[in-house]
Amino acid sequence: MREIRSILAGFGGQGILFAGKVIASAGLVEDRELSWLPSYGPEMRGGTASCSVTLSDEPIGSPLVMDPNALIVMNQPSYDKFIDTVAPGGIVIADSTLVLNMKERADITVVALPATEMAEKEGLKGLANIVLVGKLWALTNFCARESLDAAIDHVVPAKKQAMVALNKKALELGIQA
């Protein structure tokens, strides 16, 4: 899947926007066309957060993603809100630790991955978002693997460099899941 039109959604504080930045930065590393559009609910932490990320080899007409071919959701309200927007043939990756009721659609692939539980079990609390990005990469190969590592190097702030290795471990956990 060379072009990815994705929506990532969950509660504020789950790292949705960070995960979107990792995907967008991977496209930047590869000098591809990209857009990253964040959306916040009225509250930050605990409110709703989502972002649209598009990576393409062609010019992108709009940063808005209305019919994603990839959806990552980290809570039930986000699943319920976005499931019907996924384009036929698209992929949904849901954190099944927190998304318990998954509506079925015959025209898309839905992957239930207990990312929060997996991350906590591996000592990676708070990195379920990156576990889900790893799973998305494993299913779509939306960029070169090295580009994801470079993106993490770029996106993790200098004052939190100790988090680089943990994010890469979470990414690998998702890839192997």
What function would you assign to each model-found segment?
Residues 1-177:
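Active-site cofactor/cluster-binding pocket
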